[in-house]
């Protein structure tokens, strides 16, 4: 069975917290957990550790899920607003994971924040706020994307678009990192998917394929998952 690691979201203690909430909590949103396990894959949550290289040796692939902002400090900027300071602890850990799995030749798939993290890990930067792509509707917020002609996603899906996706974010890729190519854009030009140009599998989408299951008109998230798992089994 294919063994996939997923980096956790982190819930940090807040002022006035009591009980278990005085501790750092590691968690996974159920939607992405069930999506990954809908195929023949065994999922492992990877708690904070300095053993990223050991995780990379033991597992077949890595998934980076959504969650908190990337700290602008990670790409050499100051937060434009205090609430956009992000989670530097998670940033540093996930950057280590991306580098370890890539060095081991293991595939990496980024979802939402994961796409931004991969871009930053490889030397890119982010727009700190894209208000038009943010919504309180969460998994009901959708827009169209166009797949880049000749891209891996265009080959995977057999067309370039437009196709609807669930996409909720207020940060987005600004300066594309070396070693990445654009795979899809929103109608306003915002980068919505990237892929590594090297020999290993590295793909990331700004949208949430785990929310697409069975919804008419939405890009099939299963095809992307199958591509990632095929790379993990190679």
Regions found by a protein language model. Give the residues of each.
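Gly/Ala-rich beta-loop-alpha elbow adjacent to hydrolase catalytic centers
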Residues: 110, 114, 119, 123
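N-terminal beta1-alpha1 cap of cysteine-dependent amidohydrolase-like domains
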Residues: 1-107, 120, 127, 131-157, ...
């Amino acid at each position: 069975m294919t063994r996939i690691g997923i980096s956790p979201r982190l819930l940090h203690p807040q002022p006035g917290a009591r009980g278990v909430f005085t501790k750092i909590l590691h968690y996974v949103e159920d939607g992405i957990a069930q999506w990954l396990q809908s195929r023949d894959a065994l999922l492992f949550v990877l708690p904070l550790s300095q053993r990223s290289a050991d995780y990379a040796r033991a597992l077949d692939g890595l998934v980076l899920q959504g969650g908190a902002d990337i700290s602008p400090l990670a790409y050499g900027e100051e937060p434009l607003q205090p609430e956009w300071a992000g989670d530097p602890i998670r940033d540093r850990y996930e950057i280590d994971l991306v580098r370890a799995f890539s060095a081991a030749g293991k595939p990496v798939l980024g979802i939402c924040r994961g796409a931004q993290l991969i871009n930053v890990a490889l030397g890119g930067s982010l727009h700190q706020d894209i208000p038009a792509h943010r919504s309180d509707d969460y998994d009901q917020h959708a827009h169209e994307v166009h797949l880049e002609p000749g891209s891996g996603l265009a080959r995977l899906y057999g067309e370039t678009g437009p196709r609807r996706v669930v996409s909720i974010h207020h940060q987005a890729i600004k300066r594309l990192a070396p070693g990445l190519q654009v795979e899809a854009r929103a109608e306003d030009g915002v980068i919505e998917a990237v892929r590594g140009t090297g020999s290993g599998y590295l793909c990331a989408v700004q949208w949430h394929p785990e929310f697409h299951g069975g919804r008419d008109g939405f890009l099939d998230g299963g095809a992307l998952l199958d591509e990632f798992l095929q790379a993990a089994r190679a």
